Regions:
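Bacterial N-terminal signal peptides
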Residues: 9-20
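Positively charged n-region of N-terminal signal peptides that target proteins for export
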Residues: 1-7
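Long, charged/polar, surface-exposed segments that mediate recognition or autoinhibition
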Residues: 136
Length: 197
């Protein structure tokens, strides 16, 4: 009998914690109905690099600097509350204009710990907007770690203009869109591109 009561009590506690977690990620709309908050994550690869300066850790090229300014113009009105970058000159420089505009200090993450970054974003920034600058081999795995399906199969070495957006809410599948930004983007509007595996 005691084990039955303990099991019931454990289930009630877990259920209560689950409801509390759901309530923490819900907001009340003007009509009085609770709605899930949407977490928005913008992901971009660093802008064009100047490989003639330092092959191991290059700075941005002139075109890359133009793209970094375009990123600032595009995302400053989205009011991000957190910015994430890897610890390279090119990713930091891509994020620098936006960071200055929104007065946020970029947080450095380990590109080998993508899952940990996704967990941190979900836990610490639920219902908010964040920006992540990464690399051609880290963005798609991060989209997957956030629960989405990458809209492209790969990012080639000469592709710098993708702006991925992942929107997540409790109880809903993430919505992933992609658009181009900066000089001569290939995609000009948010385009949901479902990819069949």
């Amino acid at each position: 009998m005691n084990s039955f009561l303990n099991t019931c009590l454990s289930l009630l506690i877990c259920f209560g914690l689950g409801l509390g977690s759901f309530a923490a990620q819900a907001q009340v709309a003007p009509d009085g109905k609770a709605r899930s908050m949407v977490t928005t994550v913008y992901l971009v690869r660093h802008a064009e690099k100047d490989s003639t300066t330092d092959r191991a850790d290059p700075m941005l090229s002139a075109l890359g600097q133009v793209r970094a300014q375009a990123l600032r113009q595009l995302l400053v009105r989205r009011h991000p509350v957190a910015l994430f970058t890897t610890d390279t000159k090119r990713t930091r420089a891509t994020l620098a204009p936006l960071a200055e505009a929104v007065k946020l200090e970029p947080q450095v993450y380990d590109p080998k710990e993508i899952t940990a970054l996704a967990v941190r974003i979900r836990q610490e920034y639920a219902g908010k907007t964040v920006v992540v600058v990464g690399h051609s081999n880290t963005l798609l795995p991060l989209i997957e770690s956030l629960g989405g399906t990458p809209p492209v199969e790969s990012i080639s070495d000469n592709e710098y203009d993708y702006l991925f957006t992942v929107r997540t809410a409790v109880g809903s599948l993430p919505i992933v869109t992609v658009r181009g930004y900066g000089p001569e983007p290939k995609l000009t509007a948010d385009t949901p591109v479902p990819r069949i595996r």
